[in-house]
From Swiss-Prot:
Residues carrying a glycan: 265
Protein name: CCN family member 3
A biological-process GO annotation: signal transduction
Function (record text): Immediate-early protein playing a role in various cellular processes including proliferation, adhesion, migration, differentiation and survival. Acts by binding to integrins or membrane receptors such as NOTCH1.
Disulfide bond annotation, renumbered to this chain: 21-46, 25-48, 28-49, 35-52, 60-74, 66-87, 249-286, 266-300, 277-316, 280-318, 285-322
Domain IGFBP N-terminal residues, every copy: 19-90
Encoding gene per record: ccn3
Length: 343
């Protein structure tokens, strides 16, 4: 059955159900039923009483509907009176991954690290390893993933600043961040999404850039993304919050007056009140710990309007593993030469 024809059946079922529904919802049990895991508790076809959604292959009716969010509908072909049917799955487009064809809503594991599902011609995958959920703490500004013999998932280890300078790559206390305006659960990509963390800002003060590499695009090709970033202002701006006496570090500072971002010869259209990382008096440096990305409109010469991704600081961390200005960005450029950028 095609999705269009199935939709017509669903509308017809709802019309029949409306003819058999009571005028008042006063016969529901006092306690709602207990449903099996992954089975939703929904209202019956009359919109009165809570019932457990029927699953694929189970009997169904207007009072016991199927779980529609799983692509199920009640098939009444065997009952001309349309009173009792069977939950069936809507047909959808199949998926092809690594030469293997998967049916709509079929789940599979392309590797031990990912669990994927075919959703009407598109493949959506979720990681099975919890590296991004159990991140190192603020005392580990230079985390590195290592393979463990005999195990599928990698583990975090903390390197010192000296070890990273020899031949490694550090993110300088950066952590995975949320991108404002972008749906991270988008399943329109027919490949396993891979995205590195954002690099440290190329400037310790003033406007700089940070970058990451991702394949989240229509062609699933690895591309470098660049965003503007400002860890702190190079000049002491009026309106800073004054730190308390006796404190050696101020992790986060915020202006009381809105400011405009400046990029080359362009200025942000709207003023903002961003958070900046503070300073320490005991030799430690403060770098972003949790960030987001938002798109900011800039007005350029000839009144040209452009949008640029800009880092938004949520929290900062103070530590002794201080990154050198621009060094981490130069290391990343050496690791991914020739990649297209978005800035």
């Amino acid at each position: 059955m095609t999705p269009h024809l199935a939709l017509c059946f669903i509308l017809l079922i709802q019309q029949v159900a409306s003819q058999k529904c009571p005028s008042q919802c006063d016969q529901c049990p006092e306690e709602p039923p207990s449903c099996a895991p992954s089975v939703l508790l929904i209202l019956d076809g009359c919109g009165c009483c809570p019932v457990c959604a029927r699953q694929e292959g189970e009997s169904c009716s207007h009072l016991n509907p199927c779980q529609e969010d799983k692509g199920l509908y009640c098939e009444f072909n065997a009952d001309p009176r349309m009173e009792t049917g069977t939950c069936m799955a809507l047909e959808g487009n199949s998926c092809v991954f690594d030469g293997v064809v998967y049916r709509n809503r079929e789940s599979f594991q392309p590797s031990c690290k990912y669990h994927c599902t075919c959703l009407n011609g598109h493949i959506g995958c979720v990681p099975r390893c919890n590296l991004d959920l159990l991140l190192p703490g603020p005392d580990c500004p230079f985390p590195r993933r290592v393979k463990v013999p005999g195990e599928c998932c990698e583990k975090w280890v903390c390197d010192s600043k000296e070890e990273m300078a020899i031949g490694g790559f550090a993110m300088a206390a950066y952590r995975p961040e949320a991108t404002l305006g972008i749906d991270a659960s988008d399943t329109s990509f027919a490949c396993i999404a891979q995205t590195t963390e954002w690099s440290a800002c190329s400037k310790t003060c003033g406007m700089g850039v940070s970058s990451r590499v991702t394949n989240r695009n229509a062609r699933c090709e690895m591309q470098k993304q660049i965003r503007l970033c400002m860890v702190r202002s190079c000049e002491e701006e009026p309106g800073w919050h004054v730190e308390k006496k006796g404190k050696k570090c101020v992790r986060v500072r915020k202006t009381t007056k809105p400011i405009h971002f400046h990029y080359k010869n362009c200025t942000s259209v709207q003023p903002y009140k961003p958070k900046f990382c503070g300073q320490c008096s005991d030799g430690r440096c403060c770098t972003p710990h949790s960030t987001k990305t938002m798109h900011v409109e800039f007005v350029c010469p000839q009144k040209r309007i452009v949008k640029k991704p800009v880092m938004v600081i949520s929290t900062c961390v103070c530590h002794y593993n201080c990154p050198q200005d621009s060094s981490l960005l130069q290391v990343e450029n050496a690791r991914f030469p020739g990649l297209k950028t978005n800035l």
